[in-house]
């Protein structure tokens, strides 16, 4: 237990020299912001609801990167870590993986827009993608209120050639890395590429979700709605039925998505 000393300067009159009072406190007595002002404890508790046997080495590596991101002092890092964590946990929740078609469509339409300057296709792809994200948030809540049924559930799927495994990975990450100087993104790129090249469909889905999430316009949506996603993960981490928090997060995500301009 580290002692903390509080120094008080008190003047008895306008012209008197101040007297000094030193009070010693335990660091446990000092009031703190919720979650120490960081999101790392929130996402750590939410991760506890995912069976470790469902996590590959690559996913465990991503988990550690996101915990480090969530421990940073800037809001952007914490928001990104929270949103990515929610998506990954959701994809690990269903017993039978869905597909990554919505994410792949967002990625391909964005990289096409970067090359052509026409982002009409990208704007059209956002609705299905964020609808997919909203469905996934329901899966996170099921980890608390009905985990047994999740074993036999199927993740959200739109249906497309290859199940969303085929998209312009390198061009997408060129845009992602060019948009930020965060060292965490360089680490993520290496690990997400392993997930992308995996033969496991669940790993492929997670790679597509992370890649789509980090595209600059999509990341901005999650940046604006991160508070509601944090509340959801906090509720899940505390073992509460978070049905209302799911609806709140879905509403904020939809609102932020409607404001995307490219």
From Swiss-Prot:
Query: Do you know which InterPro entries this protein is assigned to?
Result: L-fibroin
Where is it chiefly localized? Answer: secreted
Q: How is it modified after translation?
A: The interchain disulfide bridge is essential for the intracellular transport and secretion of fibroin. Partially N-terminally processed to yield a short form which lacks the first two residues of the long form.
Q: List the disulfide bonds.
A: 101-160
Q: Which residues carry this modification: N-acetylserine?
A: 19
Q: Where is the signal peptide?
A: 1-16
* Entry comment describing in which tissues the protein is expressed: Produced exclusively in the posterior (PSG) section of silk glands, which are essentially modified salivary glands.
Subcellular location, in the record's words? Secreted
**What top-level branch of life does the organism fall under?**
Eukaryota
A GO cellular component annotated for this chain's UniProt record is: extracellular region
UniProtKB keywords:
Acetylation, Disulfide bond, Secreted, Signal, Silk protein
What does the protein in this record do?
It is likely that the major role of L-chain is to prevent the retention of H-chain in ER by forming the disulfide linkage.
Subunit: Silk fibroin elementary unit consists in a disulfide-linked heavy and light chain and a p25 glycoprotein in molar ratios of 6:6:1. This results in a complex of approximately 2.3 MDa.
- Protein name per the record: Fibroin light chain
Q: Which organism is it from?
A: Bombyx mori
Q: Name the gene for this chain.
A: FIBL
């Amino acid at each position: 237990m580290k002692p903390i000393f509080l120094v008080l300067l008190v003047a008895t009159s306008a012209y008197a020299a101040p007297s000094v009072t030193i009070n010693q406190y335990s660091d446990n007595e000092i009031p703190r912001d919720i979650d120490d002002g960081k999101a790392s404890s929130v996402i750590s508790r939410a991760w506890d609801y995912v069976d470790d046997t469902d996590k590959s080495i690559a996913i465990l590596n991503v988990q550690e990167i996101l915990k480090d991101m969530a421990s940073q002092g800037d809001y952007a890092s914490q928001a990104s870590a929270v949103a990515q964590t929610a998506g990954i946990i959701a994809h690990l929740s269903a017993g039978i993986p869905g597909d990554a078609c919505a994410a792949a469509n967002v990625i391909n339409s964005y990289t096409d827009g970067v090359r052509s300057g026409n982002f009409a296709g990208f704007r059209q792809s956002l609705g299905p993608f964020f609808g997919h994200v909203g469905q996934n948030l329901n899966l996170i809540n099921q980890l608390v209120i009905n985990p047994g049924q999740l074993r036999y559930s199927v993740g959200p799927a739109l249906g497309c050639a290859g199940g969303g495994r085929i998209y312009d990975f390198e061009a997408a990450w060129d845009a992602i890395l060019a948009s930020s100087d965060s060292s965490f993104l360089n680490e993520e790129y290496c690990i997400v590429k392993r997930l992308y090249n995996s033969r496991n469909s669940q790993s492929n889905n997670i790679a597509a979700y992370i890649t789509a999430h980090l595209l600059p316009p999509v990341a901005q949506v999650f940046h604006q709605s991160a508070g509601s996603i944090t509340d959801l993960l906090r509720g899940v981490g505390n073992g509460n039925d978070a049905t209302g928090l799911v609806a709140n997060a879905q509403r904020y995500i939809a609102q932020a998505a409607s404001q995307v301009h490219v």
